[in-house]
Curated annotation (Swiss-Prot):
InterPro entries: NA-bd_OB-fold. The lineage of its organism: Bacteria, Bacillati, Bacillota, Bacilli, Bacillales. It comes from the Bacteria. It comes from Bacillus subtilis (strain 168). Its main location: membrane. One of its GO terms (cellular component) is membrane raft. Plays a role in assembly of FloT membrane rafts, probably recruited to rafts by FloT. The gene is nfeD2. This is Membrane protein NfeD2. The chain crosses the membrane at residues 16-36, 47-67, 72-92. Disruption phenotype: Alters assembly of FloT membrane rafts; more diffuse rafts are seen. Double floA-nfeD2 deletion mutants are wild-type. No visible effect on FloT membrane assemblies.
Length: 174
């Protein structure tokens, strides 16, 4: 079969090369076009480019391997591409969009958090406090803010941070 005087296999191959190249460009420079998909979520450029890439790859391979008509190969390729794009959307893009941007934290973010003493804090010395959160568990050196001993297992409140060392005080729940 020919389309615009060009064999359909060649059209599939050209589409594959162009869509694949645009997908790679969008992968590298996608932040520039980040606002394009906000209004209409199903027209996400990642999904559209993935559809054309899968469609043209499926059509090209189908034309080479399958002894079916070109129209049936295009239909099968379209159905396969829609299924792959839906799976990409559900299992990759939706979880990525709802994930936290980073698991990193700033030390200032620890101020006001509750932790638990895992190494007793002596009067004029260092102990260790563990702070649990959504992003994981953070273990930091600690000193007593009130210059008093804090025993193992005590729940503490982070008051200040100096040079990576937490200043903590025992926490009494209200």
């Amino acid at each position: 079969m020919e389309l615009f005087g060009v064999p359909i296999q060649t059209m599939y191959l050209y589409t594959l090369i162009i869509a694949g190249s645009l997908t790679l460009l969008f992968l590298f420079f996608g932040d520039v076009f980040s606002g394009l998909s906000e209004g209409i979520p199903f027209l996400n450029p990642t999904l559209v480019l993935s559809f054309f890439t899968c469609f043209s790859a499926g059509g090209y391979i189908g034309e080479l391997v399958l002894p079916l008509s070109s129209l049936l190969i295009a239909l099968l390729s379209c159905i396969l591409s829609i299924m792959l794009v839906v799976l990409l959307h559900i299992f990759v893009l939706v979880p990525l969009s709802s994930a936290e941007e980073s698991l990193a934290y700033r030390e200032d973010d620890l101020r006001g958090r509750l932790g638990k003493v895992i190494t007793a804090v002596p009067v004029d010395g260092f102990g260790e406090v563990v702070i649990e959160g959504i992003g994981g568990t953070i273990s930091k050196s600690a000193v007593s803010f009130d210059n008093q001993q804090i025993s193992y297992g005590t729940t503490v409140l982070v008051v200040d941070i100096n040079n990576g060392v937490l200043s903590v005080t025992p926490h009494e729940p209200i």
